[in-house]
């Protein structure tokens, strides 16, 4: 098995850090060994495995894992919407809400993950924000990008969207991959203001979306279960916000109302237990990603940043 670490650039600290991987030995064995490969294709990628583990995380006894997890990963309990002692299960802790103001929304004079203001002026509306806490890869031109996880592998947009005509509209556009780890805040939000339509479910497997797995096969991203929501923005045009289920995360819950206008930074939904991923697609010429995201992504480094921070500006 390989011991290659996962490194990322921490935007706030301005340093490169090494990721502390939850369940690292299990993930590496599953994706980097012959024995693990047999288990992966026989059980781990299938919904029953994730269902069983998710079921266990809904047991009341699972609440005993909450405080040790907080301590081990040094989570900031001051930003939680309620006391960690009040979570009845580990899953309830996992998809926890945050206090208003815990995630300021870029381009808003006030606002938070819980309640962004309805409008912020013309300049603020031109700023898009990161849809989730996590490690982000920003590709300004998807058609020109190759090997961002492994050399020689290209992102198959038509397979990912499950719609060749829709893929053609985003060809040559920009893509953001936001990878959430189990230690992260697991609610996802709208990166732009606009009107979302009903999400479309594309069923699939539940492979890991860790770089440990994606360095082996990028196509796990379009083999996994996912949901695609189109958001019509008056500034950014049509934006596709896509949530991907992963090992131990078969449950993707949407909390927004289709057809109702949403504010930038407004909650869209949540993942239940595990690691997971959000992919955001923009049509060509509609956004210019921030330079730091593009620079580090080109170097093969994900950028750790939080929901509500700047993603880029309208093109």
At which residue positions do the language-model features occur?
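Contiguous, well-folded functional domains in the mature portion of proteins
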Residues: 1-111, 119-315
